[in-house]
């Protein structure tokens, strides 16, 4: 089973509420080093935490991070972008590009860049933070990018399994961070989510459904489209 004891962890989006919790909890679990990455990485007061500049939308930045962090055993694709409006037709072009590059292409190219590094280790892990919106298309391009990442995570899991790289996908509704500040639905505490994710990693699980919303939405994938989206059923009456 994968273990955080002695692990070298890289966290994207480490300046944010969820990323900061991943940094601290990885160390609590026994990680020997954590690369805390962001476009403008903050200063930490722990010598085990290494600030590292990384823009997940920039291929050159991704390659530079892989070159600088060749000892990584756990890659946590946590960085994400959201949108101000719900529909693909109302998003700005910049919102669409930012979401595609941050939520999908960034984790994808990070996994590709770090795959040789992780494959060379005895125990290694990739954690991809998805969303319950992976399975519920009301978030426009945000939902679309998270669905794409879910599919890519499933593919990478199969491709990397022979090399011993364990790939975990995480689905959750709202988390109490700045990104969800305007949401009025119940929110999960970041520390609780991180604890659940790291428990799942060390238990060898492949997928984390962190809340009831995620459980229900995944179960609904096999239902008729009209059951998931009642507004479509109304049009057929």
Tell me the role of every PLM-derived stretch:
Residues 46-58:
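Rossmann-fold cofactor-recognition segment
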Residues 169, 177, 181-223:
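C-terminal helical subdomain
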Residues 15, 19, 23:
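N-terminal Rossmann NAD(P)H-binding glycine-rich loop of SDR-like oxidoreductase domains
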Residues 71-72, 118-130, 162-166:
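Active-site loop of short-chain dehydrogenase/reductase
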């Amino acid at each position: 089973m994968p273990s955080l004891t002695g692990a070298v962890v890289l966290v994207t989006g480490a300046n944010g509420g969820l990323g900061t919790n991943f940094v601290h909890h990885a160390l609590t679990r026994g990680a020997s080093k954590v690369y805390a990455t962001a476009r403008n990485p903050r200063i930490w007061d722990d010598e085990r935490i290494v600030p590292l500049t990384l823009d997940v939308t920039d291929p050159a930045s991704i390659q530079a991070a892989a070159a600088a962090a060749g000892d990584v055993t756990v890659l946590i694709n946590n960085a994400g972008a959201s949108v101000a409006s719900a529909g693909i037709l109302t998003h700005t072009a910049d919102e669409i590009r930012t979401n595609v590059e941050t939520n999908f292409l960034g984790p994808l190219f990070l996994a590709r860049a770090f795959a040789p590094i992780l494959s060379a280790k005895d125990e290694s892990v990739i954690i991809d933070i998805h969303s319950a919106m992976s399975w519920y298309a009301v978030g426009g391009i945000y939902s679309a990018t998270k669905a794409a990442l879910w599919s890519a995570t499933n593919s990478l899991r199969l491709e990397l399994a022979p090399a011993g790289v364990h790939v975990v996908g995480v689905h959750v509704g709202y988390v109490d961070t700045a990104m969800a500040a305007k949401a009025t639905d119940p929110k999960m505490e970041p520390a609780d989510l991180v604890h659940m994710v790291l428990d799942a990693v060390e238990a060898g699980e492949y997928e984390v459904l962190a809340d009831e919303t995620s459980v229900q939405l995944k179960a609904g994938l096999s239902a008729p489209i009209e059951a998931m989206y009642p507004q479509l059923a109304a049009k057929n009456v």
